[in-house]
Regions:
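Short loop/edge segments at beta-strand edges and connector loops
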Residues: 6, 84, 178-179
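Short, ordered loop/turn segments at secondary-structure junctions
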Residues: 6, 124, 150-153
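Nucleotide phosphate-binding/pyrophosphate-handling subdomain across enzymes
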Residues: 20-21, 30-145, 167, 172-174
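Redox- and metal-dependent alpha/beta enzyme cores, enriched for Fe-S-associated oxidoreductases
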Residues: 148-163
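Short acidic-hydrophobic, aromatic-tinged amphipathic segments that line or gate anion-handling sites
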Residues: 175-179, 183
Length: 184
């Protein structure tokens, strides 16, 4: 088993630090101790890294080699995926498509943010309309700036979807740009 922090699990990550480039943690394990650096964002990814670390070590890979391998772990495309552009702010793409997923994503990113946290998002068309205002409220509560845009409207009017989302945000509280490319 594995865990974050103190406890009885044989594999533990302690002194966890969220940095703009990823996560840093001290590892305590039956195979020794070491420093884990993963270029992944969000503490949930630390649980994934611990699972991989334990599997590798139980398969005979040394702790040092396993830690080195995880330093280059790629993000799953569309899931807390970094878009690095020299001289530009840190941009993350995530497929958060439910209120809970959006909230967890923004909470995770807040730990890594060193400046203002922007949320550029939209809701898909022909899907649960009731969640749109809720997602707007969550974005408003957890981001410093919110920009509403189109996201696969299907048969719906993109502006109507944005208007639905905006009902969960205080008046004039979010920017709007229907053209997704322009919004990004």
């Amino acid at each position: 088993s594995y865990a974050l922090g103190d406890g009885d699990a044989p594999l533990r990550a302690v002194r966890v630090t969220a940095e703009s480039r990823g996560l840093l943690a001290e590892i305590l394990s039956p195979w020794g101790a070491g420093t884990l650096r993963v270029p992944l964002l969000g503490r949930f990814n630390l649980y994934n890294a611990l699972a991989v670390l334990g599997s590798l070590c139980m398969s005979g890979v040394t702790l040092g080699d396993a830690l080195a391998a995880l330093e280059n772990a790629p993000a799953v495309p569309g899931r807390m995926q970094r878009i690095d552009v020299a001289g530009a702010p840190l941009v993350i793409v995530d497929y958060a498509h439910s209120p809970d997923a959006l909230e967890q994503t923004l909470r995770a990113l807040r730990e890594h943010a060193s400046g203002r946290l922007w949320c550029v998002f939209g809701c898909g068309g022909d899907r649960d309309r009731a969640k749109r205002p809720l997602m707007g409220r969550i974005a408003w509560e957890h981001a410093d700036e919110v920009l509403l845009t189109s996201d696969n409207p299907r048969s719906e009017d993109p502006q109507a979807i944005i208007d639905d989302i905006a009902t969960g945000i205080p008046a004039a509280g979010a920017r709007r740009e229907c053209d997704r490319a322009a919004a990004i």
